[in-house]
Amino acid sequence: MSQQGKLFLIPTVIAENTQEGVIPSSVRIKLLSIQHFLVEDIRTARRHLSSLKIYTSIELLDFKVLNKDSAETELSEMFTPIIQGKNLGILSESGCPGVADPGALAVKYAHQNHIQVVPLTGPSSILLALMASGLNGQRFAFHGYLPIDSKESLSAIKELEKESRIKNQTQIFIETPHRNNQLATNLIKGLNPETLLCIAVDITGSQESILMHPVKEWKKKSVELPKLPAIFLFLA
């Protein structure tokens, strides 16, 4: 019986046309040993791998969809290549698999079935934003998306600010790019004037902007964010 393969977690770019700067050569080399992939969207995964210019033919690669709608019962079939002794890679739509990403489901399955998990180096917008924020990097929490409804969003912001103050904990959020300004407005409106707020937009991209000010300083500014991926962080 052949030795089983490994599950590789493969980061992708978090801003367009940044492959050369953020995807290490070690990842490109490792990718050459992987022909089977679990991806959120086959089209974007193929486009990303094509941009790295390491495969002679993308058509020879095998892709299976793993997204937020995937069920645990589907994983056994997805992991067939590993049982056959071949490596399997998880590609995130943006950044690191398993971090704010459905890849965590497959990673959990791998551990439960004694399959070696190998994380590869690459960009994470959440960690890069935290690094550049100047806020507490020893104690922090990522909350994903806040409620869309403004009233519910403001209520959640108040509760999380209270938690931040009690625990000295940085609170981290993301938002759909077209709602960036709505969330920024709610944060500036709902947070205490002395609370520190960082807004990081298009990290690693050509329009990268990472600014941190007390909320009272943000109130003096005209905040108009582009419709690009953004991370929001605050510390009370």
Predicted regions and their residues:
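A contiguous loop/helix-start segment that scaffolds small-molecule binding in enzyme catalytic cores
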Residues: S2-F8, K86-N87, I166-A236
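Conserved helicase motor
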Residues: K64-A71, L146-S150
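Class I SAM-dependent methyltransferase SAM-binding "motif I" and its flanking Rossmann-like core
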Residues: L105-E163
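Glycine/small-residue-rich loop that forms an oxyanion/phosphate-binding "nest" at active or ligand-binding sites
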Residues: N67, L75-V117
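Glycine-rich, flexible N-terminal cofactor/catalytic loop recognition
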Residues: M1-L66
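Short glycine-rich anion-binding loops that position phosphate/pyrophosphate groups of nucleotides
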Residues: I14-E16, E93-P97, P177-H178, G205
